[in-house]
Amino acid sequence: MAKNKLKGQKSRNVFHIASHKTFKAKNKAKPVTTNLKKINIMNHEKVNRMNRAFVNIQKELANFSKSLSLKSVQKELKHHENEPANVDEATRLMAQL
């Protein structure tokens, strides 16, 4: 009988609850942070991919505009080479300066 009495009357430490750590809360929070890290990594990769695509587009656009401007300048030069020099027009333009 004495054995049963001791089992029922265990004295609990008063500070047991305050010093007890909740492991379940940490376990629940841990997957969220790893998922956030994965999402951030995926977003970072997407942003880098889009930046590279825009840089390539800008380079292509610059090359395209250069080729267009060179073609137009060459056409103007060819057009002016075929015409005789207009001295009166040249003197009028110089007078405006």
Curated annotation (Swiss-Prot):
The modification Phosphoserine is found at S19, S69. Signal peptide: none annotated. Its main location: nucleus. Coiled coil: none annotated. It is found in: Nucleus, Nucleolus. GO terms for biological process: ribosome biogenesis. The modification N6-acetyllysine is found at K21. Keywords: Acetylation, Nucleus, Phosphoprotein. GO terms for cellular component: cytosol; nucleolus; nucleoplasm. InterPro entries: RBIS. Associates with the pre-60S ribosomal particles. PANTHER family: RIBOSOMAL BIOGENESIS FACTOR. Trans-acting factor in ribosome biogenesis required for efficient 40S and 60S subunit production. This is Ribosomal biogenesis factor. The gene is Rbis.
